[in-house]
Amino acid sequence: MPGGHYAHTVVADGLVFISGQLPINESGEPCTYLGFAEQTELAMKNVATALQAGQCDWRHVLKITAYITDVDNWPLFNKVYATYVGEFKPARTVVPVPALHFGALIEIEAIALRNGDSASR
């Protein structure tokens, strides 16, 4: 997980809050040279790692917020996103933005319930 002056995962009252995850590899290097689909894949993997740190997985996700720099990439985001969340359909917001840190094309944050808790959908 990348460094920074913040927590990537915070747990409070059974909720897991995951800070925005960028397409950064395990060595902490931004992978902004990748295309949108690959950046999305890497950001989603980072969210998955943060979920594990909070003792939960995709089944426990309540809300996803994705920031994308080009709305034309929205359908591609949907395609990659669906491979992670599967039949689970958390609440979701996609926010077009002019720019992201390191020149990334996407940043993803999440809120989840800790393992053992359940949510109705």
Each language-model region and where it sits:
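Short, polar/acidic, helix-capping and beta-turn segments at strand->helix junctions
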Residues: M1-R121
